Design a protein with these regions (language model features):
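N-terminal secretory signal peptides
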Residues: 1-35, 47-49, 53-58
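Extracytoplasmic "Venus flytrap"
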Residues: 66-85, 89, 93, 98-110, ...
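Periplasmic-binding protein-like
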Residues: 69, 121-128, 147-152, 201, ...
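Hydrophobic alpha-helical
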Residues: 129-143, 218, 236-298, 322
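Flexible loop/hinge segments that line or gate small-molecule binding clefts
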Residues: 138-177, 294-297
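Hinge/cleft segment of the Venus flytrap/periplasmic-binding protein
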Residues: 202-206, 324-446
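Flexible loop/turn connectors
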Residues: 283, 287-352
Length: 446
């Protein structure tokens, strides 16, 4: 049953004494009555509407709002690219943003979260290195009514539903099929040139949920190529330096390798450096794949050294999570199926590289996205995710990882899948997806 708004919920702001009383209690010295009335009226309507629908009370941000981006580490080009997207989206939406480097340290990020709350952040975008602090950060976010979304590193089987309403979204690219696709490209190249052969893997951080799902996608692809053998793997810890050392070790153990499956583009860069130093010719006598679609990854494909990468586009991650924070700060609320989301990566090779370079690398001052169009607050009728965005299947995301003792599927998640909400969300987002992820920038003139 739809509940009606009760006029008694609204202060009598037509009476000057009521306005003055509210302003005095809020210590709003220097704020005009007109500005106070504009903000108070919107806040009252939003809060009353939320109450009538059974939602928690709504706190509207004044204009853009203030957010923080807790980055995993600036040692990775991916993170720098993602921060570019976050800052561009925040600027377009009028938000104040502060970006801080977590240096691959979950405890440091927890401290940074507390510091940003103390500094007045209303929302935090988290790019965690793992699941070490996510539960505590989510708990603090709910206690202090600070909006939170997270990407990549997390605690498998810990969902926003268990954390509370203020953990608004966990979102990552769908990595199983993405990493499967780039592995297929390497296997096909090895088969076409050598008729088969040995390959190795250089992974990310051991135990990281993204690292695990990428390895599962890789291993699934290898089932279709029995002549291609994975003979060894070592962790590259997501960065160039550690990956170069890992690749050097693998070369000493397996000198006859024909392919390398690198767990991201920074890892691939380190592998290429090690291979070249050892006398190999990447792209000719050994084929390498990466992941993420960083600027460096695209340029490496252009040079012929990297065969393929799964382009999830780090700028998109930054823009997507920033836009979500903006929307919830301004009164929009997600359905259950919108709180855990995937977006579709595109396998990038020389065949489709030019479109990527034009939009994301050689774009000059032209932004790759219409950031305001991503917002359901700014564009309630014609919003566009600008990528294939869809509800997450947590069994695909975390399959093969043991569930904690006593864990059960969150009620909100199972109900959304059972009652058709998840499928309806998938269809709705597909219908709104108009601006092609790999097409020209919507901001390009002419």
């Amino acid at each position: 049953m739809v509940k009606k708004l009760d006029p008694r919920w609204f202060p009598e702001f037509e009476q000057r004494r009521v306005v003055d009383g509210h302003m005095e209690r809020l210590d709003l010295h220097g704020v005009s009555r007109r500005d106070f009335m504009a903000f108070a009226s919107a806040s009252a309507i939003a809060s009353a509407t939320a109450l009538s629908l059974g939602y928690p009370s709504v706190a509207l941000a004044d204009k853009g709002g203030k957010m923080a981006h807790l980055m995993m580490t600036l040692r990775l080009e991916y993170v720098a690219n993602a921060d570019t997207g976050a800052n561009a989206a925040a600027k377009a939406l009028g938000m104040e943003i502060t970006s801080v480097d977590g240096q691959l340290d979950s405890e440091r990020q927890l401290n940074q979260f507390e510091q940003q709350m103390a500094a007045g952040a209303q929302a935090v975008m988290l790019h965690a290195p793992g699941g070490g602090s996510i539960r505590r950060i989510a708990e603090l976010a709910n206690q202090n009514k600070v909006w939170l979304d997270n990407t990549w590193g997390t605690l498998p089987w810990f969902t926003p539903f268990e954390a509370g309403d203020y953990y608004t979204m966990y979102a990552v690219p769908e990595e199983f099929s993405a990493h499967r696709a780039v592995t297929v490209e390497v296997c096909k190249a090895v088969m076409n040139k050598f008729g088969g052969g040995d390959i190795v893997g250089v992974t990310g951080v051991e135990g990281n949920s993204t690292d695990l799902i990428r390895s599962r996608g890789r291993n699934d692809a290898l089932k279709d190529f029995p002549e291609v053998k994975l003979v060894g793997e070592l962790p590259g810890k997501w960065n160039r330096e550690d990956s170069q050392k890992a690749m050097e070790d693998l070369i000493s153990r397996h000198p006859d390798i024909r392919g390398v499956i690198a767990q991201n583009d920074d890892v691939a860069d380190g592998c290429i450096a090690a291979l070249r130093a050892a006398g190999y010719r990447p792209g000719d006598d050994v084929f390498i794949s990466g992941a993420d679609g960083t600027t460096g990854g695209a340029e490496s494909i252009e040079r012929g050294q990297l065969l393929a990468t799964s382009a999830n586009v780090p700028q998109y991650m930054g823009a997507l999570l920033t836009t979500r924070l903006y929307d919830v700060l301004h009164g929009w609320r997600p359905r259950a199926a919108e709180r855990m989301m995937n977006w579709r990566s595109i396998a990038m090779t020389k065949d489709n590289l030019d479109a990527y370079l034009e939009r994301y690398v050689n774009n000059g001052d032209t932004e790759p996205y219409d950031y305001r169009r991503m917002s359901k607050v700014e564009h309630p009728d014609d919003w566009d995710p600008q990528a294939e965005l869809f509800p997450m299947d947590i069994d695909l995301e975390w399959g093969g990882i043991a569930k904690p003792d006593g864990w059960s599927y969150p009620k909100e998640y199972t109900e959304a899948r059972a009652n058709g909400e998840a499928e309806a969300v998938r269809e709705e987002y597909a219908a709104h997806y108009k601006i092609d992820f790999f097409g020209p920038s919507p901001m390009k003139q002419g």
